[in-house]
Curated annotation (Swiss-Prot):
Protein name according to UniProt: Kynurenine 3-monooxygenase
Enzyme nomenclature, EC number: 1.14.13.9
Entry binding sites for FAD: V13, D32, F33, R34, A53, R109, L133, Y195, D314, Q325, G326, M327, N328
Record keywords, A-Z: FAD, Flavoprotein, Membrane, Mitochondrion, Mitochondrion outer membrane, Monooxygenase, NADP, Oxidoreductase, Pyridine nucleotide biosynthesis
A molecular function GO annotation: kynurenine 3-monooxygenase activity
Further information: Present with 556 molecules/cell in log phase SD medium. Deletion of BNA4 suppresses the toxicity of a mutant HD/HTT fragment.
Pathway annotation from the record: Cofactor biosynthesis; NAD(+) biosynthesis; quinolinate from L-kynurenine: step 1/3
Cofactors demanded by this protein: FAD
This protein's record includes keyword NADP: yes
PANTHER family for the chain: KYNURENINE 3-MONOOXYGENASE (PTHR46028:SF2)
Cleaved signal peptide residues: none
InterPro entries for the chain: FAD-bd, FAD/NAD-bd_sf, Kynurenine_monooxygenase
HAMAP family: Kynurenine_monooxygenase
Length: 460
């Protein structure tokens, strides 16, 4: 008889985990406290969704689980070969991601989530929406899951499973129940930032330029870096762009005291968007849409001994979105877990234990990198010194091949290099670049001093 598993959370990682385990013959039930997002009656489906950038780690994970489904699911993604930096005068500068035409890919979160749910409908997975996890009783036999169901989520309901997988996000109920069973180290950190979803509608005005109903180049991730705040935009397949404003809590609270203040702020700081974004709609969104917080979560261990439960995705390692790796990392979690189960011939206890032991260093690394990258996106991309270092980084990579790989390439385009290994290699490379930078500046200073002395002697 096949083992039964309850997967808590029908977001992106939960759906992929359900697909992976159903492919391996497990009896899978996927739960979510929300209603089915594919239904027209489901409210507030995408008011707080930062568009996704899926790259090598996420794509490779999808391919490893179901190559045919991967091709279908990702058919609407739009390749982005670099960042497009917009300055205060409306000028644009392209900064390519890769050395050989590599690209990350824009895809709408809701479209991807719904596509995964559609794939699950074709499998043996049972989908149960409107089920809120309340409690788990841990036993040596079955894990007893208590839910609250119904429209008001107040009717009690109980099911038993061989094991549980928590994919229920940063505020994971599964993790809370695991903390009652195991001694779990846990940390939660909020960044002093909030984000608001904005929208750039499709238009036919620039169709000759971009080959579609896009107002700006779809093959770039657009960034309006303003040091203490920024705006980004990623293309959707219908020609629209999902745009997101990031700013401090105090700044946003001060702005939204009046519509006129928001309007003036947008016109002053993002002058080139007023021709492509409905300004009235943007002001309305600033005032009425959720001002969502950004939280980082780290914990360890990720499992309950005996193979009773494991955490994947944001439930284990919520991160800020500035490296575009949250979903990619969560998908990679699933791929690595399935590989470990195969390695241990389905022995959950051994596979889950090894997952915690080997994965933790990588997850801490990418969570930290994501935090660091906000400064790069909002400030460094306008720095000549930063851009010079990036060019040197690329030059050394061309000369030295695989012996020198830029950090972004290792993270976004090389799923064969772990996050922790990428961070370690990049640290060594950065130290070399800084040394060469200091050496060059020192030589220029000495040269300048000698030239000055020579010229002053000539005059005397």
């Amino acid at each position: 008889m096949s083992e039964s598993v309850a997967i808590i959370g029908a977001g992106l990682v939960g759906c992929l985990a359900a697909l992976a385990f159903s492919k391996e013959g497990y009896n899978v039930t996927l739960y979510d406290f929300r209603q089915d997002p594919r239904l027209d009656t489901t409210k507030n489906k995408n008011l707080k969704s930062i568009n996704l950038a899926i790259s090598a780690r996420g794509i490779d994970a999808l391919k490893s689980i179901d190559p045919d489904a991967c091709e279908h699911i990702l058919q609407d993604m739009i390749p982005m070969k670099g960042r497009m930096i917009h300055d205060l005068k409306g000028r644009q500068e392209s900064q390519l991601y890769g050395l050989h035409g590599e690209a990350i890919n824009s895809i709408n979160r809701s479209v991807l989530n719904n596509s995964l749910l559609d794939e699950l409908e074709k499998s043996t997975t049972e989908l149960k929406f409107g089920h809120k996890l309340v409690k788990i009783e841990w036993t040596d036999d079955k894990q007893i899951c208590h839910f609250a169901i119904g429209e008001d989520l107040k009717t009690p309901h109980t099911e038993k499973y061989d094991f549980v997988i928590g994919c229920d996000g940063a505020y994971s109920a599964t993790r809370s129940q695991m903390q009652r069973k195991v001694e779990m180290d846990f940390s939660q950190e909020y960044m002093n930032l909030r984000y608001i979803e904005l929208y750039i509608p499709p238009t036919e005005e620039f169709k000759p330029n971009y080959g579609g109903n896009f107002a700006i180049a779809p093959d770039h991730l657009h960034i309006w870096p303003r040091h203490k705040f920024m705006l980004i935009a990623l293309a959707n397949s219908d020609g629209s762009f999902t745009s997101t404003f990031f700013g401090s809590k105090d700044q946003i609270s001060d702005l939204i005291t009046s519509k006129s203040r928001v309007r003036e702020f947008l016109i002053e700081n993002f002058p080139d968007i007023i021709n492509i974004m409905d300004l009235d709609d943007a002001v309305k969104r600033f005032i009425t849409y959720p001002k969502e917080s950004l939280v980082c979560v780290n914990c360890k261990p990720y499992d309950v001994p005996g193979g009773k439960a494991i955490l994947l995705g944001d439930a284990a390692h919520a991160m800020v979105p500035f490296y575009g790796q949250g979903m990619n990392c969560g998908f990679e979690d699933v791929r690595i877990l399935m590989a470990l189960l195969k390695k241990h011939s389905g022995d959950r206890s051994r596979a889950f234990t090894e997952y915690t032991q080997t994965r933790h260093k990588d997850l801490v690394s990418i969570t930290e990198l994501a935090k660091r990258n906000y400064k790069e996106m909002s400030h460094d991309v306008t720095s000549k010194r930063f851009l010079l270092r990036k060019k040197l980084d690329a030059l050394f990579s061309i000369i030295m091949k695989d012996k020198w790989i830029p950090l972004y390439t290792m993270i976004s385009f090389r799923s064969d290099i772990s996050y922790s290994r990428a961070l370690e290699r990049a640290g060594k490379q950065t130290r070399i670049l800084k040394f060469l930078e200091s050496l060059t500046l020192g030589m220029l200073s000495i040269g300048g001093y000698k030239l000055f002395k020579f010229l002053t002697r000539e005059r005397s």
